[in-house]
């Protein structure tokens, strides 16, 4: 797609220009897109102006001196209450008349803006429903009606001309200005009233995707009431407060601008406003942290307010110090982890119960230090006050007595610079990403080498951790304990200040250290000479400094993001639209306005919203740092999610030391990081941070690479390579510069993580080589012998009481026979092989159906699939195999990204429509017997095939019972000629070798030789295994002298052609699964021998098979067992695939090993700004076009990846972890 793709397509543009005027006016739909009778518009216009009319009545009565101010407002409010009741009553009556089913209000129904209504007359039900959709809940009808009356009455009082003249009389404002202010203010009131009582417009500032409880109608009236509340406070104040009067004058002017602010979406919805206000007060007023969930935020906010109130009422300064230190430490912990300990579950990556006594010892030490220093300071200050002669002696000698707080201030400055320097050394980049860290290891490929080269950095990180988490809190507590403002604690500001200060010491030691250092520097630089600065007290100074530091930091980040959008709109050729030059010129000409917008967004801690991600900047509405209303952990799961599920658990343990050592930089709530490993991209968000812990959310982005995804992923790789694998450039001055500085991503660190490494190979020359395929038959027989013998031994040694006919789980799962063996039956020493004459089953028809539909039983196929690209994510389907008893689920289909297996490329498509597949012989019913579909299922005549060996077999060794096989496995109806031809292929030497090895493993060195000799000389046992193994080989279809690649692949998938004994084999489900596993093992052995060389001895073959059984899952990506093996962290996984487009067979191997995951920091304000635009674009403009401009790849801003990482339903991460608690002390 080119850069000039439309921002909104034609359909959406028409939709937007119908919706936006409705938003501006608060609900009237004056542009419908179709013809409507004039009375529809008249109704809406009358209802819109009704509040002004009713308020005018009260105003007129007041101006005529008929009523005073209060009664004038009451009259207007009562009239509005009556009108609102009538309007809502009509709406509910019409809803009842037209039936129980009624359409949703327009604010919640996107289609309501597009429906074409047939109007019959002015009071018809459809007309009333169109003008006044009504409320869903009766409680809202009552609440909104009463609120509309109160709003109209208070607005009448608020906008009385006499009041406006008195408010602005001394400013020289004339009558014209007052009249204009009066008229425009009533327009604002009419907009708020209409959205409350008539019809609610869709707001540009939308936080929740669904307005379930009809909160949106309350947004605009609540802002109006907030403005009125300030004026009421001024009216009822005993003496005119200058600050309130100025505020009222300013708010009266802003009252006129409210419709513009609503239309631009700068004012938060009530739910977002409440959460944002609680978060800001908790962080900057009470010293807490942004919380990971809304419930935690509410509980922590209320608890912190209670602590501040209690601090105000504590009578002594010593009690204040001890109480605030203890409460600060307690609330800076994640107390929910105590519940985890009580439940008996070890906390995530924590110390368990050991953390409690350690924390108790530390807080006791902190309390002791604070109490002693405070008391000593009081004693010393008392002594200095009483002993004035000593002071005069100090002054006469020219030596000023040392101030304890000043000494501690210098110590804090030293700690700050040391910890900051040690933190800078931990990351790959320094000075905000502008330069590369020369001490960070480069071109490291293995985790072992990385650990070896970063040993010195880890020692520095441990030193920093000790200084920051142990020394700094104690020093800061000492600094605050000797503060002179503790003597004036019984003021609200100081009570809040000390509560916050002692909380920040624990909650965010690094931020608290920076703030105290700035306060100390200001004091040393002569801050006492600034008017009223010294009178504020240290703790209030800390509050102001923290706000300034945060807002300045936000301003710098937002300005950097704005410059990135501006510059790349021209420098990136694929982002350069025709309007780019015009927009750049406008931004340059209106540079002061741009800076004002950036400053305002920073001041409000609101996102800077680039409209359609163009250099057109707006102030988004303030919202919590998490940006989304829901609890983290929602995702759009797919089969590929399992890889992130395994990776996230390991990544969380690797993040802990990196966070603690400072490798991630200034890690605060709201920070975002991007992790990269092979084809996987991880989005790491910091949700919450406290003393010694951090709560993170890890998201996995889709593995299927779209074109946009590929462009940005390639740039991410370039950024990481420039930092971690860069080649030294000539010149001492510029060799350390970051070549990708200015990108939204700043490389931070490498993390050793135990993760699956993905390797794909094309099997051309291996799977189609006659030499290799000729060996497959022999390997299969050997593998099947080993599996059957091992199965019997494990049954016997386990001693369980289950029957041998129980279903065995699919190969590779941890519930397979190696983990959950089935016990053997106690049987006699003499085993009789029964002669059976069985009628041929009538189920050949459904076998034909099974064979021919095997490819269409996995998932969906679409003509839009990119056959040359990655595999599309499909919803998994279950494949059912019919047996005589029931239906058995074989597995749940999943697909590994990039896989070219036949089951994932052509899953449910009719094979007749795939002419390229016909030569492969797949699903065409080849080899099946001819049947007459018109006839009923009549039992076929008895078969003439009988068991070749009809004589009873006599075990000569008493230990042969251990290796006996179930009777059902010896009942195959196969022609004796087939088995006689294959009898020489039975590996007798291998059979004897396996017997000796298994006896050695089971019995040890005791009677090993005698038992082994007896078993090897037992011809009945060998005959039994010969018969069963060869029968399985024939039934599976693996008796071909030379396999074709197509037949090998079909047998590997368990979808081979119909054979004479296939029905018998599938009826014995357990034996079928063992046989299939043996064939898959033999295919893996074939691939290994072709790659690594042939197996040279029986002992090597035995060891190889044992390794397969213990450490490998060998099967299909579409098996549910594949997912289970990934979650259970099976060391290796192997699968075959078939690329139909290229005509090649492939292998895929996942190996679990420790690899280096690259992690970089993202511009958090850039992320918030793009998410704000996404919210506006999808929830308001409904611009969900998959090819829209704002979702196109942007290699500098990483726009496509950022949109993917948003919470559903706006984003689409395929995995999102619940909040993960990490202990980082």
UniProtKB/Swiss-Prot annotation:
Residues 803-830 are annotated as: Disordered. Its main location: membrane. Residues 803-821 have a biased composition (Polar residues). It is found in: Membrane. It is a multi-pass membrane protein. GO terms for cellular component: membrane. The chain crosses the membrane at residues 40-60, 70-90, 141-161, 172-192, 222-242, 250-270, 272-292, 311-331, 347-367, 398-418, 466-486, 504-524, 592-612. Keywords: Glycoprotein, Membrane, Transmembrane, Transmembrane helix. It comes from the Eukaryota. InterPro entries: Pecanex, Pecanex_C. Glycans are attached at residues 383, 1173, 1200. Belongs to the pecanex family. This is Pecanex-like protein 4. It comes from Danio rerio.
